Curated annotation (Swiss-Prot):
Family designation: Belongs to the NAD-dependent DNA ligase family. LigB subfamily.
Record-listed E.C. numbers: 6.5.1.2
Protein name as catalogued: DNA ligase B
Keywords noted in UniProt: DNA damage, DNA repair, DNA replication, Ligase, NAD
Gene: ligB
Pfam families: DNA_ligase_aden (PF01653), DNA_ligase_OB (PF03120)
Catalytic residues identified in the record: 128
Top EC category: ligase
Length: 561
């Protein structure tokens, strides 16, 4: 399969649908643009060196591709005069390829694929095997040289490693001079790309081939997919038959004639969702007829194109970090993103899971993160890919300031937790007030009608009808809904205002009896340990909670009298 990963990045041309540069360009002053472009370029150069010189992949290939696309976009947005980086500058070896390795155009979407197919004939399709590219040189049928792709013109000598790999024939049936180009891949059993992704298969092969020696067991785990025979027959069918006669069965088994876009989409979907012996990251479209090998160059030609699988991971830019504080005081950082597509979903927000994880990752606006879908539906933060050159200052809430007994009023800094308390109070696990949700509370708070958790109990029609968004009818409907709270039983009210979990404890319908229990008395109840007993005692003794009980007593709510 044509090597369309980092082993040939300098020869890749990204065919993108109408970029609309103006709408995608960041709103940066010149100095910031220069520093951000330089920082991303340096990060990519570090990845390139690690991969090509050390055989270590620090980043998934699809994220690398997206990072390069972003770098190219930024350069075009700001005309930054940083020197163009060569991703293969550390991959060049001493051995010249007898025939250069060409690159491949990457087609971004359905329209690009249809455009490439239009007007062409003698078309074929293959899976785009996720491996590392190699040239195999045979003289009189005997393997004499194996060369890494390098920069497409020169590569490293892999001959000693190739001698150990059983998938590479040491002697061909025909005693002829033969040049083959193909992909060395990590063997997998019934690998389904859509379910398992690339499982770092290509990096395993790259890492082994970067070593001086590999064990027989490691060598046996490497397979070969021959995707071209530069000095073979001009006709594609004849080339495939010849490769099959040489013993390269996979080339014929996985290469099929192609007539139209529908067939291309069908094969792409089939190879994405059905078992294969190797990882893939798309399909290769190629014309059967191509120029003589003497005319090949280490650049993307017109007769080959790649159509990649949907991204399993997307590169997303963080626009803002919001700190969502729940009713119990738990702080959850939520990242606002420049929207990205994953499968058929648009992802614009993602949670870091916890404040501790956010602190560990230290994600700031401008950082580039990796996002995937957990279970194919839920956006998941996989990690930081690169950081903004300028680290944004942020106001970060202190974990010690928020807990089960904080933020009973809409005071500065308490907005998030207080609103979460109200949402819980009116929700299904609280008072279950019909038609009352976060939007209702936000409107009432923003218009100064609610400052404390139970202020809504004293609202009247005259106060509501003058609030924007509350007409005569909606005001009456809201008051009717709020009125139903008075009918709720005592224990429902306890949960609604934030009672900690009580296990199997007895809960008499009397506030004063519960408030009078000591830690030891709580601990004597079923399912109550020392920690929970202390929490329950603290809840009932908290001055803010006691003030709530007095308000409910004044409103003649059952159990609080």
């Amino acid at each position: 399969m044509l090597p369309t990963f980092r082993l040939m990045t300098c020869a890749i041309v990204f065919v993108l649908p109408g970029l609309g540069h103006a709408s995608q360009c960041p709103d940066w002053p010149a100095a910031k643009a220069r520093s951000e472009v330089t920082a991303l370029q340096q990060q990519i150069a570090e990845w390139d060196d690690s991969y090509h010189r050390q055989g270590i992949s620090q980043i998934a290939d699809e994220l690398y591709d997206q990072a390069r696309q972003k770098l190219n976009l930024w350069r075009s947005c700001f005309a930054v005069s940083t020197p163009e980086s060569d991703p293969l500058k550390t991959a060049v070896g001493p051995l010249p390829h007898p025939v250069p390795h060409t690159g491949v155009n990457k087609l971004a979407d359905e329209g690009s694929v249809k455009g490439w197919l239009k007007g062409r004939n003698d078309l074929w399709i293959q899976p785009k095997v996720d491996g590392v590219a190699v040239t195999l040189v045979y003289e009189k049928g005997r393997l004499v040289q194996a060369i890494s792709r390098g920069d497409g013109r020169k590569g490293q000598d892999w001959t000693s490693q190739a001698r150990l790999i059983k998938a590479i024939a040491q002697q061909l049936p025909q005693a002829e001079s033969t040049i083959l180009q193909g992909e060395l891949y990590w063997r997998l059993d019934d690998h389904i790309q859509a379910a398992s992704g690339s499982v770092n298969a290509r990096s395993k092969v790259a890492g082994l081939l970067a070593r001086q020696t590999i064990s027989p067991q490691q060598a046996d785990a490497i397979g070969l997919f021959v995707w071209d025979w530069p000095n073979g027959p001009a006709d594609m069918a004849q080339r495939l038959a010849g490769l099959q006669a040489m013993g390269f069965e996979d080339s014929a088994a996985y290469t099929h004639p192609l007539e139209n876009y529908v067939q291309a989409a069908r094969w792409r979907e089939h190879w994405y969702r059905n078992p294969l012996p190797f990882a893939t990251d798309g399909v290769i479209l190629r014309q059967g007829q191509r120029p003589p090998a003497q005319r090949w160059q280490a650049s993307a030609p017109y007769w080959i194109a790649a159509w990649k699988h949907p991204y399993a991971q997307a590169l997303a830019e963080v626009r803002k970090v919001n700190f969502k504080i729940g009713r119990s005081g738990r702080i959850t950082p939520v990242l606002e993103l420049t929207p990205v597509r994953l499968d058929d979903r648009t992802v614009s927000r993602i949670s870091t899971g916890s404040l501790q994880r956010w602190q560990t990752l230290d994600i700031r606006p401008g950082d580039q993160i990796a996002v995937s879908l957990a279970g194919l539906t839920i956006p998941r933060l996989d990690g930081v890919v690169s950081r903004a050159a300028e680290r944004a200052d942020m106001i970060i809430p202190r974990a010690d300031d928020f807990h089960e007994l904080s933020c009973w009023q809409a005071t500065p800094g308490c907005e998030s937790q207080f609103r979460a308390r109200l949402a819980w109070l009116s929700g299904k696990k609280g008072l279950a007030l019909p038609g009352v949700g976060p939007g209702t509370w936000n409107t009432l708070i923003d218009n100064g009608q609610i400052m404390g958790l139970l202020d809504w109990m004293t609202l009247n029609h005259a106060e509501l009808v003058n609030i924007p968004g509350f007409a005569e009818r909606s005001s009456a409907k809201l008051l009717d809904s709020l009125q139903t709270a008075r009918e709720r039983p005592f224990q429902t009210w306890l949960k609604a205002i934030g009672l900690p979990p009580t296990g199997g404890a007895r809960l008499p319908d009397n506030w004063h009896e519960l408030a009078g229990r000591s830690v030891e008395q709580w601990q004597a109840e079923p399912g109550i340990g020392p920690g929970r007993a202390a929490r329950l005692r603290a809840f009932f003794q908290d001055p803010q909670v006691q003030a709530l009980s007095q308000q409910l007593q004044a409103q003649s709510i059952s159990g609080f009298k």
